[in-house]
């Protein structure tokens, strides 16, 4: 049994605290199918990559609802093949990711057996930090005196 310490990532990622907790819980539960990566591509851009070899885009459904992203896959065997050995797993799966506040799904691409889901964090203007100008108290009174004289 492997133990992973993900605490260093908690300090360096913004907006994915709950998602990292989910990753930590997944490692503890032992459910690792399908394997996936979570990466930060820029300040407010993230990407989840799932290894889905053997699946096609038609076999996969992505649902985003509020702060939850669900990826489900079910391979439909259209042709009956006589496998001597079947090492490529195409079992049904369901992955649920809890997204942080203001994280939205931007798009999804499927290429070379990898499903890549782009996420972006769009903070509302009212919640972004802003610079506040500091006026000198004496200058404020002089300005009002000039206004009255004019």
Curated annotation (Swiss-Prot):
Keywords: Stress response. It holds the Pfam family HSP20. It comes from the Bacteria. The keyword tRNA-binding does not apply. GO terms for cellular component: cytoplasm. Residues 27-137 form the sHSP domain. The keyword Metal-binding does not apply. Belongs to the small heat shock protein (HSP20) family. This is Small heat shock protein HspE. It comes from Bradyrhizobium diazoefficiens (strain JCM 10833 / BCRC 13528 / IAM 13628 / NBRC 14792 / USDA 110). The lineage of its organism: Bacteria, Pseudomonadati, Pseudomonadota, Alphaproteobacteria, Hyphomicrobiales. The gene is hspE.
